Amino acid sequence: MAKKTVEGEHGTPKTNFTKKETSKNHDDFKKIIGHKVVEEHYVEYEVELTSGKTITATEFDFKGDDSLLSTYKKKVTKQSDDSSGEYAVERVLAHRKVKGSPLYLVQWKGYPHPVWNSEMWEEDLDNCKDLLAAYKKHQEDLKIAQTPKKTPSKTPKKTPKSLKRRALTPSDDEEEAGPIAPEPKKTPKQSTKKLKRTTSPETNLVEKSKKKAIPDLENHTLDQEKNDVIERVEEIQEDEDDDDEQREEVVTTAPVETKSRWGFGSWKWF
Protein backbone atom coordinates (compact mmCIF):
# COMPACT_ATOMS: atom_id res chain seq x y z
CA MET A 1 0.00 0.00 0.00
CA ALA A 2 1.08 3.58 -0.53
CA LYS A 3 2.75 5.53 2.22
CA LYS A 4 0.89 8.57 3.50
CA THR A 5 2.12 11.66 5.28
CA VAL A 6 0.93 12.35 8.81
CA GLU A 7 -0.19 15.59 10.42
CA GLY A 8 2.67 16.53 12.69
CA GLU A 9 4.83 13.86 14.26
CA HIS A 10 2.15 11.38 15.39
CA GLY A 11 -1.15 12.26 13.72
CA THR A 12 -3.87 10.77 11.58
CA PRO A 13 -2.75 9.69 8.10
CA LYS A 14 -3.42 12.08 5.26
CA THR A 15 -5.17 10.04 2.57
CA ASN A 16 -5.69 12.54 -0.26
CA PHE A 17 -2.64 12.67 -2.58
CA THR A 18 -2.47 15.26 -5.32
CA LYS A 19 -2.48 13.28 -8.56
CA LYS A 20 -0.50 14.65 -11.49
CA GLU A 21 0.19 13.14 -14.84
CA THR A 22 3.26 10.92 -14.99
CA SER A 23 5.63 10.65 -17.91
CA LYS A 24 4.83 6.94 -18.44
CA ASN A 25 1.64 4.84 -18.55
CA HIS A 26 1.85 2.42 -15.63
CA ASP A 27 -0.94 0.31 -17.13
CA ASP A 28 1.64 -1.12 -19.51
CA PHE A 29 3.96 -2.21 -16.66
CA LYS A 30 4.15 -6.01 -16.50
CA LYS A 31 6.88 -6.61 -13.91
CA ILE A 32 9.98 -5.04 -12.30
CA ILE A 33 13.19 -6.78 -13.37
CA GLY A 34 15.65 -4.89 -11.15
CA HIS A 35 16.79 -1.48 -9.85
CA LYS A 36 19.86 0.71 -9.25
CA VAL A 37 20.56 3.66 -6.94
CA VAL A 38 21.61 6.89 -8.69
CA GLU A 39 22.76 10.18 -7.19
CA GLU A 40 22.84 8.58 -3.71
CA HIS A 41 19.08 8.70 -3.01
CA TYR A 42 17.16 8.12 -6.23
CA VAL A 43 16.26 4.63 -7.48
CA GLU A 44 15.74 3.69 -11.12
CA TYR A 45 13.74 0.55 -11.89
CA GLU A 46 14.10 -1.65 -14.93
CA VAL A 47 10.55 -2.48 -15.97
CA GLU A 48 9.24 -4.94 -18.54
CA LEU A 49 6.16 -3.76 -20.43
CA THR A 50 3.25 -5.89 -21.61
CA SER A 51 4.60 -5.47 -25.13
CA GLY A 52 7.86 -7.18 -24.11
CA LYS A 53 9.85 -3.94 -24.30
CA THR A 54 12.09 -2.91 -21.35
CA ILE A 55 12.18 0.68 -20.01
CA THR A 56 13.58 2.62 -17.05
CA ALA A 57 11.11 4.12 -14.57
CA THR A 58 11.19 5.97 -11.24
CA GLU A 59 8.99 5.71 -8.16
CA PHE A 60 6.99 8.66 -9.47
CA ASP A 61 5.99 6.71 -12.60
CA PHE A 62 4.06 4.18 -10.45
CA LYS A 63 1.67 6.80 -8.96
CA GLY A 64 -1.94 5.65 -9.07
CA ASP A 65 -1.17 1.94 -9.11
CA ASP A 66 1.83 1.15 -6.93
CA SER A 67 0.92 -2.41 -6.02
CA LEU A 68 3.57 -3.73 -8.40
CA LEU A 69 6.21 -1.46 -6.81
CA SER A 70 5.17 -2.27 -3.22
CA THR A 71 5.49 -6.01 -3.87
CA TYR A 72 8.98 -5.50 -5.31
CA LYS A 73 10.09 -3.38 -2.32
CA LYS A 74 8.99 -6.02 0.19
CA LYS A 75 10.84 -8.67 -1.76
CA VAL A 76 14.10 -6.65 -1.87
CA THR A 77 14.13 -5.27 1.72
CA LYS A 78 12.38 -8.14 3.51
CA GLN A 79 10.35 -5.42 5.22
CA SER A 80 6.58 -5.00 4.97
CA ASP A 81 4.39 -1.92 5.04
CA ASP A 82 2.74 -0.80 8.24
CA SER A 83 -0.76 -2.21 8.13
CA SER A 84 -2.14 0.88 9.86
CA GLY A 85 -0.88 3.02 7.01
CA GLU A 86 0.64 5.69 9.26
CA TYR A 87 4.05 6.98 8.24
CA ALA A 88 6.11 9.99 9.29
CA VAL A 89 8.57 11.88 7.07
CA GLU A 90 12.06 11.78 8.55
CA ARG A 91 13.68 14.25 6.18
CA VAL A 92 13.66 15.73 2.69
CA LEU A 93 16.56 14.25 0.70
CA ALA A 94 16.53 15.94 -2.70
CA HIS A 95 14.33 17.43 -5.38
CA ARG A 96 14.04 17.73 -9.15
CA LYS A 97 11.92 19.78 -11.52
CA VAL A 98 9.04 18.11 -13.35
CA LYS A 99 7.23 20.40 -15.82
CA GLY A 100 8.64 23.41 -13.95
CA SER A 101 7.45 22.34 -10.47
CA PRO A 102 9.70 20.94 -7.71
CA LEU A 103 9.19 17.28 -6.88
CA TYR A 104 10.72 16.41 -3.49
CA LEU A 105 12.24 13.06 -2.52
CA VAL A 106 11.53 12.14 1.12
CA GLN A 107 12.72 9.42 3.48
CA TRP A 108 10.28 7.77 5.87
CA LYS A 109 10.97 7.02 9.52
CA GLY A 110 11.83 3.36 10.03
CA TYR A 111 12.45 2.74 6.30
CA PRO A 112 16.12 3.56 5.55
CA HIS A 113 16.47 1.56 2.31
CA PRO A 114 16.44 3.81 -0.79
CA VAL A 115 13.65 1.81 -2.47
CA TRP A 116 11.23 3.06 0.21
CA ASN A 117 11.96 6.73 -0.63
CA SER A 118 9.01 8.55 -2.18
CA GLU A 119 8.67 11.59 -4.47
CA MET A 120 6.00 14.10 -3.42
CA TRP A 121 4.78 17.53 -4.51
CA GLU A 122 5.14 20.48 -2.16
CA GLU A 123 1.39 20.63 -1.44
CA ASP A 124 1.56 17.02 -0.23
CA LEU A 125 4.06 18.09 2.46
CA ASP A 126 1.82 20.52 4.33
CA ASN A 127 2.19 18.57 7.57
CA CYS A 128 6.00 18.77 7.54
CA LYS A 129 6.63 22.39 6.58
CA ASP A 130 9.48 22.70 9.09
CA LEU A 131 11.42 19.89 7.41
CA LEU A 132 10.80 21.41 3.99
CA ALA A 133 11.91 24.88 5.18
CA ALA A 134 15.11 23.39 6.66
CA TYR A 135 15.83 21.63 3.37
CA LYS A 136 15.33 24.85 1.35
CA LYS A 137 17.64 26.80 3.69
CA HIS A 138 20.28 24.10 3.36
CA GLN A 139 20.10 24.37 -0.43
CA GLU A 140 20.53 28.16 -0.28
CA ASP A 141 23.56 27.81 2.00
CA LEU A 142 25.13 25.34 -0.42
CA LYS A 143 24.52 27.69 -3.32
CA ILE A 144 26.18 30.59 -1.49
CA ALA A 145 29.14 28.44 -0.43
CA GLN A 146 29.70 27.21 -3.97
CA THR A 147 29.59 30.71 -5.48
CA PRO A 148 33.16 32.05 -5.79
CA LYS A 149 33.73 35.29 -3.96
CA LYS A 150 34.87 38.22 -6.05
CA THR A 151 37.90 39.95 -4.60
CA PRO A 152 38.97 43.37 -5.88
CA SER A 153 41.91 42.86 -8.14
CA LYS A 154 44.89 45.07 -7.54
CA THR A 155 46.43 46.55 -10.66
CA PRO A 156 50.16 45.77 -10.59
CA LYS A 157 52.50 48.67 -11.04
CA LYS A 158 53.84 48.92 -14.54
CA THR A 159 57.56 48.43 -14.85
CA PRO A 160 59.39 50.41 -17.56
CA LYS A 161 60.16 48.20 -20.52
CA SER A 162 63.89 48.85 -20.39
CA LEU A 163 64.17 48.06 -16.68
CA LYS A 164 61.88 45.05 -16.96
CA ARG A 165 63.83 43.61 -19.85
CA ARG A 166 67.12 44.24 -18.07
CA ALA A 167 65.86 42.56 -14.89
CA LEU A 168 64.40 39.49 -16.58
CA THR A 169 66.83 38.77 -19.42
CA PRO A 170 70.31 40.23 -19.90
CA SER A 171 71.06 41.90 -23.23
CA ASP A 172 73.12 40.22 -25.91
CA ASP A 173 76.08 42.49 -25.18
CA GLU A 174 76.03 41.54 -21.51
CA GLU A 175 75.81 37.81 -22.33
CA GLU A 176 78.71 37.90 -24.78
CA ALA A 177 80.90 40.15 -22.67
CA GLY A 178 81.36 37.60 -19.91
CA PRO A 179 82.95 38.51 -16.59
CA ILE A 180 84.27 42.05 -16.30
CA ALA A 181 88.05 42.19 -15.93
CA PRO A 182 89.30 44.23 -12.96
CA GLU A 183 90.59 47.70 -13.82
CA PRO A 184 94.42 47.83 -13.79
CA LYS A 185 95.99 49.80 -10.98
CA LYS A 186 97.50 53.14 -11.98
CA THR A 187 100.93 54.25 -10.83
CA PRO A 188 101.31 57.67 -9.21
CA LYS A 189 103.13 58.90 -12.30
CA GLN A 190 100.34 57.88 -14.65
CA SER A 191 97.75 59.37 -12.32
CA THR A 192 99.67 62.66 -12.22
CA LYS A 193 99.93 62.79 -16.02
CA LYS A 194 96.25 62.06 -16.39
CA LEU A 195 95.43 64.74 -13.81
CA LYS A 196 97.55 67.30 -15.63
CA ARG A 197 95.96 66.41 -18.94
CA THR A 198 92.53 66.70 -17.44
CA THR A 199 93.05 69.93 -15.53
CA SER A 200 94.96 71.81 -18.27
CA PRO A 201 92.53 74.32 -19.81
CA GLU A 202 94.68 74.77 -22.93
CA THR A 203 94.71 71.05 -23.56
CA ASN A 204 90.96 70.88 -23.16
CA LEU A 205 90.44 73.77 -25.56
CA VAL A 206 92.62 72.49 -28.37
CA GLU A 207 92.05 68.78 -27.82
CA LYS A 208 89.62 68.45 -30.71
CA SER A 209 91.66 70.62 -33.07
CA LYS A 210 94.80 68.60 -32.31
CA LYS A 211 92.99 65.38 -33.07
CA LYS A 212 91.90 66.73 -36.43
CA ALA A 213 95.35 68.13 -37.30
CA ILE A 214 97.35 65.01 -36.49
CA PRO A 215 97.67 63.81 -40.14
CA ASP A 216 98.79 67.30 -41.35
CA LEU A 217 101.31 67.67 -38.54
CA GLU A 218 102.84 64.32 -39.34
CA ASN A 219 103.31 65.25 -43.03
CA HIS A 220 104.63 68.68 -42.09
CA THR A 221 107.11 67.14 -39.63
CA LEU A 222 108.49 64.76 -42.26
CA ASP A 223 108.95 67.58 -44.78
CA GLN A 224 110.59 69.78 -42.17
CA GLU A 225 113.04 67.07 -41.16
CA LYS A 226 113.92 66.48 -44.81
CA ASN A 227 114.56 70.18 -45.40
CA ASP A 228 116.70 70.39 -42.25
CA VAL A 229 118.87 67.52 -43.48
CA ILE A 230 119.33 69.17 -46.87
CA GLU A 231 120.23 72.52 -45.29
CA ARG A 232 122.69 70.80 -42.95
CA VAL A 233 124.40 69.06 -45.84
CA GLU A 234 124.65 72.37 -47.71
CA GLU A 235 126.13 74.09 -44.65
CA ILE A 236 128.74 71.34 -44.27
CA GLN A 237 129.58 71.62 -47.97
CA GLU A 238 129.95 75.40 -47.71
CA ASP A 239 132.22 75.04 -44.67
CA GLU A 240 134.43 72.62 -46.58
CA ASP A 241 134.63 75.01 -49.56
CA ASP A 242 135.62 77.88 -47.26
CA ASP A 243 138.41 75.78 -45.74
CA ASP A 244 139.74 74.94 -49.21
CA GLU A 245 139.79 78.62 -50.22
CA GLN A 246 141.62 79.61 -47.06
CA ARG A 247 144.25 76.94 -47.65
CA GLU A 248 144.78 78.16 -51.21
CA GLU A 249 145.23 81.73 -50.04
CA VAL A 250 147.81 80.71 -47.50
CA VAL A 251 149.76 78.81 -50.09
CA THR A 252 149.73 81.61 -52.65
CA THR A 253 150.56 84.49 -50.27
CA ALA A 254 153.35 82.85 -48.27
CA PRO A 255 156.96 84.30 -49.06
CA VAL A 256 159.10 82.10 -51.18
CA GLU A 257 162.50 81.40 -49.72
CA THR A 258 165.27 80.71 -52.21
CA LYS A 259 168.36 78.92 -51.30
CA SER A 260 171.72 79.31 -52.92
CA ARG A 261 173.15 76.38 -54.42
CA TRP A 262 176.20 77.20 -52.44
CA GLY A 263 174.42 76.84 -49.18
CA PHE A 264 174.59 80.38 -48.00
CA GLY A 265 170.96 81.22 -47.95
CA SER A 266 169.38 83.99 -49.89
CA TRP A 267 171.30 86.64 -51.72
CA LYS A 268 172.03 89.70 -49.71
CA TRP A 269 173.73 92.89 -50.83
CA PHE A 270 176.06 94.54 -48.54
UniProtKB/Swiss-Prot annotation:
Domain Chromo positions: 87-147
SMART domains: CHROMO
One Pfam family from the record: Chromo
Location (main, coarse): nucleus
Entries under InterPro entries matching the protein: Cec-4, Chromo-like_dom_sf, Chromo/chromo_shadow_dom, Chromo_domain
Protein topology in the membrane: Peripheral membrane protein
Biased composition (Basic and acidic residues): 205-229
A cellular-component GO term for this protein: nuclear inner membrane
Keyword Coiled coil among record annotations: yes
Assigned keywords, A-Z: Coiled coil, Membrane, Nucleus
SUPFAM superfamilies in alphabetical order: Chromo domain-like
PROSITE patterns registered for this protein in UniProt: CHROMO_2
Gene3D superfamilies from the UniProt entry: 2.40.50.40
Region (Disordered) residue spans: 1-24, 143-229
Protein's job: Chromatin anchor protein which binds to methylated lysine residues on histone H3, thereby recruiting heterochromatin to the nuclear periphery, especially in embryonic cells, with a lesser role in differentiated cells. May be required for the correct positioning of chromatin and nucleoli in embryos.
Protein name: Chromo domain-containing protein cec-4
Gene designation: cec-4
